[in-house]
Amino acid sequence: MGVAMRRMGPKLKQVKRRREGSSITSQAKGVRMSGPGVARRQLLLNTARKMLRTTRLAELSLGEVARRAKVGKGSAYFFYDDVNALCASLKGLIDNEFQEVLRAPLTQSVSSWQEVIRLLYHRGIAFLENDPAACQLAIGVDASPALKLMDRANDVVAGRIFDEQISQRFVLPIIPDRPKLFFRALSLTDMMLSISMLERGKITPEYVEEGCRAAIAYLQIYIPEKLPRKKPEEFD
C-alpha cells in the first residue's frame, strides 16, 4: 500500500497541477488580464462587431473572428470559450452604450409624457438601425436564448431610465415598482421589432410605430393620460 502510494505520488501531483492550472485559466478569463491581453480582447470585440454588419450572427465563428482580427486562435479561446461567450461580451458592451444614449438629457420641448416615450424610443431605434451588430444581438432571428435574456436585463435598466426621464418633466403617480411598468412596455416594443426582423429582415417604420403604440397603450392603463408638469426650477 505504502509503495503504491509512493509510486502514485508524482501522478497525483501532476493531476493537482493540471487542476490548479485550469482554475487559474478560468480566473484569468474573467478577472486578470495584462495590457496586451486587454488590447487583444478589445480587438476581437471590435472585429466581431464589424463582421456583424455583413455577416449573419448564426454564421459567426470565433476562429474566423480571430483570423480577421489577427489574434492567435489560442488567445481567442483563452478569452472566450466559444463564439457565444464572445457575443455575450459584445452584447454587454453595446448595452452600456445604448443606456448612455437613453440617459442623454432631453433638449426638446415636450408637452406630454407620451412624447417623452416617443423621443426616447426613437433614440433607441436610431441606435439599432445604425449598428447592425446591436440589432442582431438584441432582436435578430439568430439571437440565442442567452442573448435574449441579456436583452431583457437591458430592458430593466432602460425601463428605469424611461421612468427617470419622464420624472424630470412630469409628476408621475406613486406606483409600487413603477419602473417595472416601463420594462414591460419596452418588452412589447421588442416583440414588435423582433416580428419585423422575422418577417422583413429589418426594422420597418410600420412595426416601429406598432411597438410605440403598444407601449403607450400599456402604460396608459396605469398612468393618467395627462400628468402635472414640473416647473423648470423643479427639474432634477
Where are these regions (language model features)?
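N-terminal intrinsically disordered/low-complexity leader segments
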Residues: 1-39, 223-236
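Generic hydrophobic, amphipathic alpha-helix propensity
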Residues: 37-48, 65, 90-98
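Helix-turn-helix
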Residues: 51, 55-85, 89
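Alpha-helical DNA-contacting segments of helix-turn-helix folds
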Residues: 52, 87-97, 101, 154, ...
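Amphipathic alpha-helical packing segments from all-alpha helical-bundle domains
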Residues: 118-119, 146-171, 180-183, 187, ...
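Amphipathic alpha-helical segments used for helix-helix packing
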Residues: 127-148, 163, 191-197
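Hydrophobic/aromatic-rich alpha-helical bundle segments in the mid-to-C-terminal region
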Residues: 168-215, 222-236
